[in-house]
From Swiss-Prot:
Interacts with protein of the S100 family S100A1, S100A6, S100B, S100P and S100A12 in a calcium-dependent manner. Component of some large E3 complex at least composed of UBE2D1, SIAH1, CACYBP/SIP, SKP1, APC and TBL1X. Interacts directly with SIAH1, SIAH2 and SKP1. One of its GO terms (cellular component) is cytoplasm. Pfam families: CS, SGS, Siah-Interact_N. Keywords: Acetylation, Cytoplasm, Nucleus, Phosphoprotein, Ubl conjugation pathway. This is Calcyclin-binding protein. Residues 2-80 are annotated as: Interaction with SIAH1. Its main location: cytoplasm. The lineage of its organism: Eukaryota, Metazoa, Chordata, Craniata, Vertebrata. Residues 73-228 are annotated as: Interaction with SKP1. InterPro entries: CacyBP_N, Calcyclin-binding_UBL-bridge, CS_CacyBP, CS_dom, HSP20-like_chaperone, SGS_dom, Siah-Interact_N.
Length: 228
């Protein structure tokens, strides 16, 4: 029954209750009045609940903006130095001190470290260094975030030892670039190796000078003059 009809019934019962004089009739009308009032109350609660549900359904769903980290940039520029206890690597990243602490992560092994900076100005930054020159202490190594800088502290496993290079690869590359002098080889061969190295690394003027000296040397040798 509609709420309007129940309200009319209630008004009529109230009128009858005012006119009734016999107890039995009044008790019956009072019971009916309570019943109708309960029905009206339930109807109103149901109506309010439906209205609230409609309002909830009409609300636009909350849109959660995804956190995009964009692409990952590999870090290739850095500086390093050392103390008796630590090898220190300095990486410059503008604004890195403003990202949450958990966004700057470093994983250490005995001969490597892996830096990952997440969601810095919409990008992630990664730096992986393998084959460190010497072993480090994983437990003793750490990181520090300063203004626009990440400082990686690699604790030397053997203190008071000097690192001439950061990695074994760098050491091998540098050693290959050095002229080789073998005491057991002919001294003139060692000199030729040095000249060859200078020639390969020199500019056009240097190459012309060496070529001229080489030609003159060959001409002297052809004449029996061994001076160079």
């Amino acid at each position: 029954m509609a709420s309007e009809e129940l309200q009319k019934d209630l008004e009529e019962v109230k009128v009858l209750l005012e006119k009734a004089t016999r107890k039995r009739v009044r008790d019956a009308l009072t019971a009916e009045k309570s019943k109708i009032e309960t029905e009206i109350k339930n109807k109103m609660q149901q109506k309010s609940q439906k209205k609230a549900e409609l309002l909830d359904n009409e609300k636009p769903a909350a849109v959660v903006a995804p956190i995009t980290t964009g692409y990952t940039v590999k870090i290739s520029n850095y500086g390093w130095d050392q103390s008796d206890k630590f090898v220190k690597i300095y990486i410059t990243l503008t604004g890195v001190h403003q990202v949450p602490t958990e966004n700057v992560q470093v994983h250490f092994t005995e001969r490597s470290f892996d830096l990952l900076v997440k969601n810095l100005n919409g990008k992630s930054y990664s730096m992986i260094v393998n084959n460190l020159l010497k072993p480090i202490s994983v437990e003793g190594s750490s990181k520090k975030v300063k203004t626009d800088t990440v400082l990686i502290l690699c604790r030397k496993k053997v203190e008071n030892t000097r690192w001439d290079y950061l990695t074994q690869v760098e050491k091998e590359r540098k050693e290959k670039e050095k002229p080789s002098y073998d005491a057991e080889t002919d001294p003139s061969e060692g000199l030729m190796n040095v000249l060859k190295k200078i020639y390969e690394d020199g500019d056009d003027d240097m190459k012309r000078t060496i070529n001229k000296a080489w030609v003159e040397s060959r001409e002297k040798q052809a004449k029996g003059d061994t001076e160079f």
